[in-house]
Structures are given as C-alpha cells and as structure tokens.
UniProtKB/Swiss-Prot annotation:
GO cellular component: cytosol
Protein name: UPF0301 protein Mmwyl1_0539
InterPro entries given in the database record: AlgH-like
Signal peptide: none
Pfam families in the record: DUF179 (PF02622)
Organism: Marinomonas sp. (strain MWYL1)
Length: 188
C-alpha cells in the first residue's frame, strides 16, 4: 500500500457530466475533512425547499434579522439529512466549531443558529441539512474513476456566488468549460 497521501481538505469536488447519482449530479462539494480514514463534505449549490424561517420555526428560534427570513437552507448531502451544518467564516466560532482553515469553519449547533437568527452570526455562512461522506479509499476511487474534478476552494465561490452559478464558477477556477466535456469516460 502506498504510504503517500494527499488530502483534499479545503478543496471543491465538482461532479463530472457522467455522474448520474441524483444526490451528486451537477454538484459542487466543499471538503471539510479528508484523511486516510475517509472524507466529509458539504454540497454548496443545492438549495432545498426549506428557508431559514421554516427551520427557525421548527426549532423554536426567533429571527431578529429580517434579511434572514428568506435565506435558503441547502441540501448538504444524503448523510445525516436531518442534521444541520453551517459552513462559515472564522470571525465567529462556537464551542463545537471545527476550524477547516484560517478562513473557513464548520459548526453544527443550536447555539450557532440562534446567534445567526439574532444577527450575531459570522460575516458569511451557508446553512445545510445533511452532508456527504466517504469511507476510507472511497473518494480516492471515485476521483480515479473520473467522477470528480478537484480544485482548491475559492472563498468567493463558496460564500458570495449565487447557488445557481456556483457550478460554473467552480469549473472556471480550473479554467474548464464543462459544456465542452464529454459525458463519456475512458482511459485510452
């Protein structure tokens, strides 16, 4: 077994055209963790049919920041689909916050949602339900199978690009026009 390991933590996974899994088709995933034991990420470009008001009502949280009322909640992936995750800038952290980089953190607490609802949250954030997960070697096999393009994450794409434009914006980070790629794969 090869002892060399490259972590793709703080990278985007961009689904390839032939990937027809309904959970991951036409998605951009931000990888929060990637070790030899597996990987965990959040789909960033799939708004759900739930907005912040509905989530806050369900959790008994009062919203004091009017701009949040229609803030979409995103489908972060098929794993733990009922659990909330918040990708956010590191200007605000909580006791259970996982610092991914110096600029990006991941939180999953009611306290974080309450602070956001009060208008005391981080400068930029994305709230999701669920995440994506891979067992040891699974993500590497999918990348070797050409299911994913991988590039370093871009904060502007992550937090400031509308979800319907994130797929194209992420591919531009790589300098690729996905409309020119064939859905067929091969290794020659």
């Amino acid at each position: 077994m090869n002892a060399f390991f490259d972590s793709f933590k703080n990278h985007f996974l961009i689904s390839m055209p032939h990937l027809d899994d309904p959970h991951f088709e036409h998605t951009v995933i931000y990888l929060c963790e990637h070790t030899k034991a597996g990987a965990m990420g959040i789909i960033i470009n799939r708004p759900s049919n739930v907005d912040f008001t509905e989530l806050a009502d369900h959790l008994g949280i009062q919203i004091h920041s009017p701009r949040l009322s229609s803030e979409p909640i995103y489908t972060g992936g098929p794993v733990e689909a009922e659990r909330g995750f918040i990708l956010h800038t590191t200007d605000k952290v909580w006791s259970n916050t996982l610092r991914v980089t110096d600029e990006v953190s991941l939180s999953a607490s009611l306290e974080a949602l309450e602070d956001i609802a009060q208008g005391n949250g981080p400068d930029a954030f994305r709230i999701t339900l669920g995440c994506a997960g891979w067992d040891a070697g699974q993500l590497e096999a999918e990348i070797a199978n050409n299911d994913w393009l991988v590039c370093e994450a871009d904060l502007d794409v992550l937090f400031h690009t509308p979800s319907d434009m994130q797929f194209t914006a992420a591919t531009r980070v790589l300098g690729i026009d996905m409309t020119r790629l064939s859905p067929d794969i091969g290794h020659g």
